[in-house]
Regions:
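Short, well-ordered beta-strand elements
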Residues: 122-126, 197, 201-210
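Short Gly/Thr-rich strand-loop-strand
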Residues: 73-76, 144-190, 233
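N-terminal export and membrane-targeting signals
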Residues: 1-10
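Short, surface-exposed beta-strand/loop micro-motifs that present aromatic residues
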Residues: 108-114, 191-199
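N-terminal "mature-domain start" segment
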Residues: 21-112
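C-terminal motif of bacterial Sec signal peptides marking the signal peptidase cleavage site
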Residues: 16-19
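A short acidic-to-branched-hydrophobic micro-motif
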Residues: 108-140
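Surface-exposed amphipathic alpha-helical segments
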Residues: 210-234
């Protein structure tokens, strides 16, 4: 979605909060051999909302209590701006039409959670495909795209806000999850972690932003994804 860059543009930059990531009990820790890729029954579009985290879980992971739900989506939001490099838009932002167009996805559900000032922001999305094979195909294509975009500077030009440029770091894959960090240029340390995986017939695609995210981004993205994956039907 495109809410993250808009919120970041208006945020008042603050110092990084060290060690603010917590672990949800029962969720595999990042870096282990266990990942979310165990295959269960397919998830229907009507079930997607059930696997998203509630606001309390998001607050716990992000180490705050001030975040609330800004909006939820049951459609892929259309791009209301332009990218300097559309082929890398999917590496910077999660669940954007520029990345999913032509993929054959069937349904999507996502929610934006923020503290209102942009200090902490999470966009969690789940996208259903017709089969597990289709979901894994999209995951593999995304992984290839992210690797090709390493080091690139991607500017998003929103219709009603100032342009924001992001620099893409090298992705890391562990436990079935691929995650990268994108740094906001001239953002005083503000960065977003972007993580993606596939479980059953669903792609889990999340973004988490805050100051200091560069140091902990892979862990944050993986923790959110594992928590979502843990809510899938067995």
């Amino acid at each position: 979605m495109l809410a993250a860059p808009v919120i970041c543009a208006s945020a008042v930059w603050v110092a990084a909060v060290a060690g603010c990531v917590s672990t949800i009990p029962g969720v595999p820790r990042v870096g282990g051999d266990r990942g979310p890729l165990s295959w269960g029954p397919d998830v229907a579009g009507a079930q997607l909302a059930d696997v998203l985290l509630d606001v309390a879980q998001v607050n716990q992971i992000m180490g705050t209590s001030a975040m609330t739900v800004l909006r939820t989506y049951d459609q892929m939001p259309g791009d209301d701006g332009t990218y300097s490099d559309p082929t890398c838009a999917g590496a910077v932002f999660n669940t954007v039409e520029a990345a999913y167009k032509g993929s054959g996805y069937l349904a999507t559900r996502s929610s934006d959670v923020s503290d209102g000032g942009g200090k902490h922001y999470v966009d969690q999305g789940v996208v259903a495909f017709g089969s597990g094979a289709d979901a894994r195909k999209f995951l593999a294509a995304s992984q290839d795209s992210w690797r090709r975009c390493v080091g690139k500077h991607v500017t998003y030009n929103a219709k009603n806000d100032s342009p924001i440029t992001w620099t893409i770091r090298a992705p890391v894959t562990a436990g079935g999850i691929t995650a990268t960090v994108v740094d906001q240029e001239a953002g005083d340390g503000y960065a977003c972690a972007h993580g993606i995986t596939a479980k059953s017939n669903v792609v889990i695609d999340v973004s988490a932003c805050s100051n200091g995210m560069a140091e902990k981004g892979v862990t944050v993205a993986s923790t959110i994804i594992n928590a979502i994956a843990g809510k899938f039907p067995a």
